[in-house]
Amino acid sequence: MKKYIILLILSGFIITSSFAQEEEPSSDPVYAPFESGILIDQQTGVIPDARTLEFIIQHKFGSMDNGRSDLWGIYSPGANVRLALNYVPINNLQIGAGITKKNMYSDVNAKWTVFEQTDDNSMPVAVTLYGVAAIDGRNESAFGTGKVVETKGEALPASVSFSDRLSYFSQLLIGRKFTDWFSLQAGASFTHYNMVGWDYNHDVVGAHAGGRIKFSPQSSIIFNYDQPVKIESISEQTDWDTFAKANFSVGLEIATYTHAFQIYAGSANGILPQDMMMY
């Protein structure tokens, strides 16, 4: 009888230990901190699996200022669209290229998730670096060159070189999935345009925040906020008349296994991040 009791106790200990081991959090990356690599106007730390090719469509209607006469922006002028392809050559590294209607931008971009948040909190946040270089493809006559020939601020009518058309955006993002239904991220960015109008700054520093509140397995409320920061020490202007306004957007995300659809309203017409930070 004692043998059986000892065996039962040992068996119970082994079973209990195995269950305890299974319940311990692993050092694996957390599952789906966001449903997509894009959160309205921002990036996230999400990058698809290696050797994934991703097609992106981003579309914005015009201003809602005229209300129902323009069907709240659907018929109003100023619509913007971007088509892009992203490819993931290795895990946690994504490269891409796209074209945008506004300013006829062509862009190349890269995103690297340096650290992923883990289940056991050995890495409590995800850290991501993102960068974009874009070319303004408009005709020379569309440019305000910013090349001042008189103190009145008159600019040369043309003389736009290839390098004048270039703009850059770099960003650091830190995000965390707090629960299965709530994720939040914050970031800082630097924007540079090689050439701008005489009344603009070439450089803009930005602060960013965004998040997701999930209310069903496929649906979430999403939001983002982008704030150009006024820094007098790097400003080339004496006032802030042309300084970009903050961008706030809120919307609904519906996700499937392979797609994420986002419907939202926001205050920025631009799609490329440097365009939103500058204009």
What are these regions (language model features)?
Residues A186-K230:
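A mid-sequence, solvent-exposed acidic-amphipathic segment
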Residues M1-Y31:
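Cleavable N-terminal export/targeting peptides
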Residues G12, S18-F19, A142-F143, L184, ...:
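Compositionally biased regions
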Residues Q21-V160, L166-S170, F178, F182, ...:
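Transmembrane beta-barrel domains of Gram-negative outer membranes and organellar outer membranes
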